[in-house]
UniProtKB/Swiss-Prot annotation:
Protein name: GSK3B-interacting protein
PTM text: Phosphorylated by GSK3B.
Example GO biological process: regulation of Wnt signaling pathway
An example molecular function term from Gene Ontology annotations: protein kinase binding
Gene3D superfamilies, A to Z: Hypothetical protein (hspc210)
Deleted gene: phenotype: Knockout Gskip mice die at birth. At 18.5 dpc, embryos are still alive but rapidly die within 5 to 30 minutes after casarean section. Embryos obtained at 18.5 dpc are cyanotic, suffer from respiratory distress, and fail to initiate breathing properly.
Organism domain of life: Eukaryota
Disulfide topology: none
Subcellular location: Cytoplasm; Nucleus
Subunit structure comment from the entry: Forms a complex composed of PRKAR2A or PRKAR2B, GSK3B and GSKIP through GSKIP interaction; facilitates PKA-induced phosphorylation of GSK3B leading to GSK3B inactivation; recruits DNM1L through GSK3B for PKA-mediated phosphorylation of DNM1L; promotes beta-catenin degradation through GSK3B-induced phosphorylation of beta-catenin; stabilizes beta-catenin and enhances Wnt-induced signaling through PKA-induced phosphorylation of beta-catenin. Interacts with GSK3B; induces GSK3B-mediated phosphorylation of GSKIP and inhibits GSK3B kinase activity.
Length: 139
């Protein structure tokens, strides 16, 4: 499994309070996956074209589906479970049963593998945040 990373306090851009972002799924204690999926979407919406929790795919305590369109205009259907996130389809609201894609512990890791433009947007957002911290420290 590849190395996951967690952004340094991008929470101010995503609208979440400090400490509320998903670092992984261990200890989630079978939380409502729709709530988890909404948090995932809000955390990285700045770095993709479109991303939303599916309204037509079944949601349960242990699974939710997220549709994402990358900045490269590639569409994916993602499955969110206690195991993590994985691609299950290459169109919105589509599950291709034959796919054997790996699970990713974080949305950052998954998008990093799917979208070079995500990496660039993430890097730019991180740089802006660091520059803001530097300015605040010099005041």
């Amino acid at each position: 499994m590849e190395t996951d990373y967690n952004p340094v306090e991008l929470s101010s851009m995503s609208g979440f309070e400090e400490g509320s972002e998903l670092n992984g799924f261990e200890g989630a204690d079978m939380k409502d996956m729709q709530l988890e999926a909404e948090a995932v979407v809000n955390d990285v919406l700045f770095a993709v074209n479109h991303m939303f929790v599916s309204k037509s795919m079944p949601c349960a305590d242990d699974v939710a589906y997220i549709n994402v369109e990358t900045k490269e205009r590639n569409r994916y259907c993602l499955e969110l479970t206690e195991a993590g996130l994985r691609v299950v389809g290459y169109a919105f609201d589509q599950v291709e049963d034959h796919l054997q894609t790996p699970y990713h512990e974080t949305v950052y890791s998954l998008l990093d593998t799917l979208s070079p433009a995500y990496r660039e947007a993430f890097g730019n957002a991180l740089l802006q945040r660091l520059e803001a911290l530097k300015r605040d420290g010099q005041s």
